[in-house]
Amino acid sequence: MNAPHVLIDLLGACWEVDAAVVEVAWDTWGQCAGFALGDGTLALANGLWKGGPRLKPREDGGVEFVQAQAPPAPLAYVRVHEGTCLALAADPEGGLLSGGDDGRLVHLRLDGASELVAHEVDAWIDRVAASPSGGRSYACGRRVHWLGPKPACLMISGSATSMAFDPGGTRLAISHNGGVTLWAADTLRERELVWPGYHRNVAWSPDGRYLVTGMEENALHGWRVADAADIEMAGYPGQPRSLSFSADGSFLATSGGMRAVCWRFDPPRADDTPHESGIAGKTPVSRVACHPVHPLVAVGYHGGEVMLCQPGSSDILLVKGAGNGAVSAMAWSPDVRRLALGTGAGNLAIVFLPDELFRFGRRKQTGFPDGG
């Protein structure tokens, strides 16, 4: 790797706010990145930077950086909760869905107009999930609500810790103490996947065949959904609180260590050992986000660094240096050319990372990004 500068300094738009970033999500069309803040505000960052930095092809090959000709647009702020934003998701019909500790589920349009979707008295709405096919759901404690033409409510065995729709949007996975509950959209019937322990987050493989949770017991647990066969993945020094599958489903990247930990999933095998990726920072990994197309992982650290790496490789591209709090949220844009990130100290950024920045060989997962 030959990267003379930190990429955020060359290709990034940065802002600072007076509250921690809880979550970040892009709207369905990638026009805007919404940052849910700890003070109940949504900060909207325009993802279309007119006169922003760009890459210019060189006559002799490679690319060169062209500096921005205009500053990025300022953030737009919308107060959506009386307390804290707790959950955020892109709404399939446009805009964003936000849940908060005031018991409100709010739909926010990109023009700043908001609509109250649901209100739970004396309860927190701390989990929100949506699918491109139109599914919308939220949870408050043990109650999970399915929104739509035929709304329904499901009482699960423990408080919901995470929710995710499968790739087809037909099943909702809800993690909790003791395992995962699957809720089918067509029949509204539930199915239990049981494993002892506290399951804090959940992720589907892109083909919907596997489901994985990160556990408080410093381990992962997975299931082959068809027959509920168990997949055990242990040995973490810390809790794997962030999970992300590669676009082709060949590997799962997680936090929980000093480097990103990647497990093979093509398919998973009982004797497989994970591959650590990137380099060890001075602090543990806090967030991971796989690139939507390429075999790359964006890795955020508690110390504030953000790097790009490939599974099993120690080569990295440095996106952001240390400082400004732990990386608390990351999300790739729908057009896969921008990475939005936020920290616990209120540092927000959108970094332009187009395909021209990377160089891959013909074989799968070969070659590494060329810093120019």
Regions found by a protein language model. Name each.
Residues 1-372:
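WD40-repeat beta-propeller superdomains and closely related acidic/aromatic-rich repeat-like regions
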